[in-house]
Amino acid sequence: MNKVWLSIACSFLLLAAGALPSRAVELRIGRDALERTLKQQLFAGPNGRFYLKGTPSSACAVYADDARVTFIQDRILVKVKTRARMGKSVGGACIGISLSPQAEVSMAPYGEGESIGFRDAQLVKVSDQRELNFLLTPFLSRQVPSSMKVDAADLLRKALESSTVSSNYKVTLDRLKVHSMQIKGNTLIVDVDGDISVK
């Protein structure tokens, strides 16, 4: 994801170097970058798992892993594999049922000041088991969208700081405003404007 933000930072640097007034610029964020963000922020536990119930050492536990992000029309679809051992723990074993359904949620991207957020979460596919859905529904509709939120200004500032070392120019992002976004193919195109200083 750092390469994406470094190229974005270079775009801003070119605008600043040309002494142009603040105008809208397009940030292009690939599907893979959003998927990495989700995995880093939510699936950072042991073996890339997020435990909805229990822990890695629990006999009975429910976890999600293997998150995949795809773009469909104007929405972002997140698919996760769910593994559930539901029942009663007896002598270190889970006596009950094992389930491994795939769950899906779609959401719409939107601009939120300096950030790219996600809202209007709609459950596309969940389990047939009511007990499992009790855990999956809040996870998919709240935790997944909030974990995909990207602070664009913060990432650009970090990319600009690293460019200062190689260029000997102090480049800072003073302001960033996300206006609108749309999905084209495997890219989320974000219209932003901002101010950059070069010293």
Annotate each predicted stretch with a short phrase:
Residues 23-199:
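Extracellular/lumenal and peripheral-membrane lipid-interaction modules
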Residues 1-5:
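Positively charged n-region of N-terminal signal peptides that target proteins for export
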Residues 6-9, 30-32:
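Short helix-onset patch at the extreme N-terminus, typifying the N->h transition
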Residues 16-24:
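Bacterial Sec-dependent signal peptides at the C-terminal "C-region" and cleavage site
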Residues 7-17:
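Bacterial N-terminal signal peptides
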